Amino acid sequence: MASVEQPNKPKLKLYSYFRSSCSFRVRIALNLKGLDYEYVPVNLLKGEQFTPEFLKINPIGYVPALVDGEDVISDSFAILMYLEEKYPEHPILPADIHKKAINYQAANIVSSSIQPLQNLAVLNFIGEKVSPDEKVPWVQRHISKGFAALEKLLQGHAGRFATGDEVYLADLFLEPQIHAAITRFNVDMTQFPLLLRLHEAYSQLPEFQNAMPDKQPDSTSPTAS
């Protein structure tokens, strides 16, 4: 992968789990910006996020976390904003304030109203409260509600990508969520033609494809699934 020169600096380290959509967002950004990084797998199913070593990096025990020299940043949105300011090559935010606002809104719908309801802790909790036949439909309903809002938000703004013909922040949040909806939760995407079209556009971009869960080194681990 082509990389931006970082003289006299150690390589970036990304603590990631292959299936984590939050980590997926950051992997896309690193690829878009051409930043070389070391992938450090954290197996969530084995509880490695709660080890003393990882909790020193991120006390809340979530992935992703990024180490850049002496800087340690956790939370995908914080990481993306850090990367945008420190490594401005291939900006992930548009200059236009109105378009920027749409990007923030789309990212927030995903990160606040959809993704938290499908994370591992929530799925385990829901699995204790409902039958196995009810768990996936519960997740599908919440994803579909968020997707319906995104379809309305992006109407009139989308071009080749979510907010025009360049890849921006909204796209980094959308593709991991769409991918999870299709591959993990069997959401019927024909209800959301705009999002489905965007998903197909992302499939043509190597920066997105190289960030896919099945392309990560920990996806082949016997305990990964």
Curated annotation (Swiss-Prot):
It catalyses: RX + glutathione = an S-substituted glutathione + a halide anion + H(+). It is an enzyme of class 2 (transferase). Keywords: Cytoplasm, Transferase. Its EC number is 2.5.1.18. Residues 96-221 form the GST C-terminal domain. Its main location: cytoplasm. InterPro entries: Glutathione-S-Trfase_C-like, Glutathione-S-Trfase_C_sf, Glutathione_S-Trfase, Glutathione_S-Trfase_N, GST_C, GST_Zeta, GST_Zeta_C, GST_Zeta_N. The keyword Transferase applies. Gene3D superfamilies: 1.20.1050.10, Glutaredoxin. Glutathione binds at S20, S21, C22, S23, F24, R25, Q49, V63, D75, S76, Q115, N119, L120, A121. Residues 10-91 form the GST N-terminal domain. It is found in: Cytoplasm. One of its GO terms (cellular component) is cytoplasm. GO terms for biological process: glutathione metabolic process; L-phenylalanine catabolic process. GO terms for molecular function: glutathione transferase activity; maleylacetoacetate isomerase activity. Belongs to the GST superfamily. Zeta family. PANTHER family: MALEYLACETOACETATE ISOMERASE. This is Glutathione S-transferase zeta class.
